[in-house]
Amino acid sequence: MAGNKPFNKPQTEPRERDYQLDGLKVPPHSIEAEQSVLGGLMLDNERWDDVAERVVSEDFYTRPHRHIFTEMARLQESGSPIDLITLAESLERQGQLDSVGGFAYLAELSKNTPSAANISAYADIVRERAVVREMISVANEIAEAGFDPQGRTSEDLLDLAESRVFKIAES
């Protein structure tokens, strides 16, 4: 039977999951939405309350964006305007201007923001991605607890899982 190729039997069992590759996955985020929230706030300070109702600094994926948002919150709380100059000056005083990308990066944030009018939608995207990242984190914690129950029963583990997921739902 020359020329006959071996026949590949259809796979009937699910492929084994490669847990080593799980560590290579990039958590969900939207750098563009984060940039547009920050840039939009520099363009329109009046939208602060809309944004602050939706996101907190921990919702931002990148450390520089978390620092920028935190500094914006400080400016807002002190009654100072949030714009390129005041934000850069405040970050410089905190010793963080270079670590967030410098003056040029802050300028790009406001310059590249599509529209400050859509800032609530951008903030919703940032929050949505943060919730999904938290779900992933909790799922990993639950899996770790299952692999190493430390004497806990399955009921204890279910209670743990339920409380952790419920905490996300409440936030």
Q: Would you name each region that the model predicts?
A:
Residues 1-131:
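Noncatalytic partner-interaction/assembly domains of nucleic-acid and motor enzyme complexes
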Residues 103-171:
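Extended, charged alpha-helical coiled-coil/arm scaffolds that mediate oligomerization and mechanical coupling
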